[in-house]
Amino acid sequence: MQFAAPLVPGRLVQRYKRFLADIDTDDGRVTVHCPNPGAMLGLNAPGARVLLSRSSNPARKLPLTWELVEAELPGGAQWVGINTQRPNALVAEAFRAGAIAALAGHDALRPEVRYAEASRVDFLASGAEAGPCHVEVKNCHLMRRAGLAEFPDCKAARSARHMRDLAQVVADGGRALVVIVVQMRAEAFDVARDIDPAFDRAFREARAAGVAVRAYRCAVGPEGVAIAEEIPVITPP
């Protein structure tokens, strides 16, 4: 996914109220939209280099959106995508390119399909002989050990519910896949069980029930973000 226009560089002053950040740019200090509800551990250090996209919508109160941060992570500095609204589009793009091996044989992705009393699945993949597949996408940008991506970075009750709902899909004879989009360089994925033991339990139970899980690292840079390759999920049973 290429950014539509060159990103605006800046330096992070502070992130606050979860969805707001103050950024110093060449044109002065601005308040921007921070499209991330998580803790952003290791990604919100004051003074960090950031890159912002500009909306063409004149009605937007905050025309700039925080997209990337150059974070000092274990293993060295790297660009990290912090926009949690991007992963679904990244998965759709990779699906069209045939880069999601777990969805080989499917020919269509329908977004936002209701499948449980209080849940919507991100995509319903169809067209395969094996039948439709419920696809849930999770954004990941936590790294506390070099090369190891983790999720979640805060309590994730909603994500735990998604795992339970997907396990029920499989129990009812359906198919389900969780795609973890890692918006940074990483070599493997694991659950941050110390941050949210309840999600860890739901994740393990869903896998044991037959929910497939695949993790993909992204190539991230000022020009764009794209799914690059699958990485192993090392969470034990």
From Swiss-Prot:
Q: GO molecular function: any one?
A: DNA binding
Pfam families associated with the record: SfsA (PF03749), SfsA_N (PF17746)
- TM annotation in the entry: none
Q: Which domain of life is it from?
A: Bacteria
Family named by the database record = Belongs to the SfsA family.
Give the protein name, as stated in the record.
Sugar fermentation stimulation protein homolog
Q: Which organism is it from?
A: Methylobacterium radiotolerans (strain ATCC 27329 / DSM 1819 / JCM 2831 / NBRC 15690 / NCIMB 10815 / 0-1)
Q: According to the entry, what is the taxonomic lineage of the organism? A: Bacteria, Pseudomonadati, Pseudomonadota, Alphaproteobacteria, Hyphomicrobiales
Question: What gene name is given for the protein in this entry?
Answer: sfsA
